[in-house]
Amino acid sequence: MRNAHEMEKALLALFPAAGLEYSFPEISELLDSRSREDKIELSLALQKLLKKKILQESGEGKFTLFGKDKTALTGKVDYVNPRTAYIRLEGEGKEEKDVMVQPDDLRGAQDGDLVEVELFASRRGKQEGMVTKVLQRARNQYVGTLRMKGSTGWFNADYRKMHDEIMVAESDLAGARDGQKVQVQILHWGGANRRPQGKVKEILGQPGEHHAEMHGILAEYNIPLRFSEETEAEVAQFSGVISEAETRGRRDFRPVLTFTIDPFDAKDFDDAISFQELSDGNLEIGIHIADVSHFVQPGSKLDEEAFQRATSVYLVDRVSPMLPERLSNELCSLRPNEDRLTFSCVVKMSRDGKISGKPWIGRSLIHSDRRYTYEEVQTVLEGAEDPNAEVLRLLNRFAIQMRETRLASGAMSFESTEVKFVLDENGVPLKVIPKIRKDAHKLIEEFMLLANRLVAEYAYYFEDGKRSNPMVYRIHESPNPDRLQNFADFAGRFGYKINVSESKVAMSLNKMVASLEGRPEQELMQNLAIRVMAKARYTTKSSSHFGLAFAHYTHFTSPIRRYPDVLAHRLLWNYLQNEARPEKDKLETLCNHCSEKEKMAADAERASVKYKQVEFMGFQDTSRLYEGVVSGVTEWGIFVEITENRCEGMVRVSELNFDQFDHLEEEYCLVGRRSGTRITFGDKVKVRLKGTNLEKRSIDFYLEEIAGATLQRKPAGKQPKVWPSGKRRRK
């Protein structure tokens, strides 16, 4: 016999969608509830669902899902923990509170899914409801570990918001064995009375193996591990020799001094700079970009797959390219001493760095004379001899001027520090080194920003008499006022004043960045400020770029690794040739897809960095002291970032056993009751490694010193807890 809760769940499973109707006898038969006791429980469950307005009675004595009067909202599932999920509302209902949903009421929906949710009557001020329809799945495959129970596989996903165990039938194991890391594709999503079911799509290897883990990260974020045979076959058809027909109509820059500047280990050179003096004493500077759109034609398998990928993904040890390597590293790469097809933005500049006239934009042909690395150019900028030293130093002076102009116009000066790894032949991390951006990097960056801005302006003002042409713009909206105010309040506690008025906020934030120079909290405050900013995205609606202080901006300079740049090239060429204009709505759909894929790629890249940081720390001496900075404070512990390698870990409450602590949430600190010890965001500390967990991608530390004071921890045993502000244990 089912209890009331089980009966309610069984009833809900009978009504997966609107339109189904059952009488009481039909329900009793379907649920095999024939005994008197079962029918009583069934009747009670029906009455409960009627009262909740989940079900309603039709005029024919049948039951169906509650109809038109029920409030239906749309949102995405945030499955925060195994006991609770929230529907983050969007669209017309977004002014409502988020809707809390019990796991049984998700009806098979998972984290990130776009769903329709219906509200229950308000309970104790909470807005609760149940999922009635899954509109769009966020993902249909997961990466994790397979465990065998008899002949059946049970799969646990690495993704921390996938809380359901997935059943894999013997016929769907594809040869996978107990304990292996696999990729599983969902066959059935399950529901209130059944677990999800899947099949093994790919065996990745053993957990902890370098290649298995990196492949696992790619698979986890739906990034393909290889190109389709059809795409590779199309690429194989390209001859590799530029024909006379392909050069026709292109402006020839081959006689002009041209060079590339890239990382030392780069293979996909998608931008080059040319430089020549004109007869009138001015300078002509060309920004030449690989003409990927010449090869990637609409309607081809190559174009279809490039669009689906939308971006190259750069993990710690490998690249998952947007284009097959024959294109990205060979035919499109602007390699030295080879003719290459390009799309160019050419500007005329005076010797004092002022741009005159309109840029020339069009298809071109170049021949790179020299491939520079950033390191080589930096030595030249610092005084080393080079045949092109005068040109490089002049370009650097122009780049510095352009940067100063941007900042004076309200551009943001944030620079977050990234890390790079030195790996051995087996992928084991030997070193973690913060990347340092120098003038050589900024030189190229400023000229690429210039080209992107000029191309966006060119497209925006390029009219065919009646209307502006659609374009793929890169926009960055102003920060959300509430989030900005919260950050200003936070920064104010540390002595930084932020003016949140729209006209002053950029200058105010830049002033804060300047005052942070050399302080322990510099990197942390900058990262927090960056998080407050809106996310840049692609759209057909031209709007200003807040972070760069540009009225119009696009992505034009990296078509080997970004699909929006391919679209920008394609659109520009259509307009220059007066060819058909695309439908704006369809183009907006492409923009949305590219924005989503960009976020997914960034998440995958961060996951690979975190994994390798944890792996690196796992090999370190547990007796060594590391200098670090408190990067976060919670009631369950503090986060510390090691200064020399940017590895972040946690000192848990159980290790802060030299005192009892109150968590003062609004002051971002822990305060010891007896000692008065104050641990707050930005504090300099020394920590010692306690341990690592690769599966959870976490690092644990012992706290040894705060501001130079050595701490005396008690032996392990029953530990005091951290008490939230204002709460005390009852005597």
Question: Model-derived features: where do they sit?
Answer:
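Charged, low-complexity terminal tails
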Residues: 1-168
